[in-house]
C-alpha cells in the first residue's frame, strides 16, 4: 500500500529519463519493481530472460498495474537493483561461462566496479531500463560516468526509470523528477 500511488488512475511518462525521489519507505522502489515486473522483468533484476529466484518477496502491485506502450517497442532492457545485485552478479557469471553475456569475474571486483560493468555492458539504444538506487554502489565519480552513459543511451531512444537519492543523478539534464513524499506523487 503506497499512499502516493493508491489514488492514481494513470501516469504518463513523456521524457526519456524519469527519476523517482522521496524519503525511505515512500514506495519508490516498490513502484519501480512493480513497473519492471509488469514489463516482464525478473523481480530480482536482470533481463526479461533471467528466471532465477532466491526469495519471492516482490510486491503484488504489478498485478494491479497495466503498462501501455507507444508504437516503438524496446529491443532490449534491464532491471538493475542495488539490493539484489549479488544475486544478479552470480547469474551474470553463470551466463558468462555459457558465453551469453560479457560480464565475467564480477565477484572478484569491488561492488562499484562490478555494478558499473553490468550497467555499461547492457546499455543499448532503443531499450528500456529500470535502475533502483544505482548510487548505492557507486562513488560520485562513477555516478557521473553512469550519468553520461545514460545520457548517451537516452539520446539514442532508450527510456530510463531510476529511483535515487543522489543529488548527482537528480541533476540529470531534462529528466522528469517525481517525488513520492507526503503520500502523493
What do these predicted ranges mean?
Residues 17-19, 29-97:
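ABC ATPase nucleotide-binding domain signature region
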Residues 109-133, 141-153:
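GG-anchored amphipathic helix commonly corresponding to the ABC/SMC/Rad50 NBD signature/C-loop
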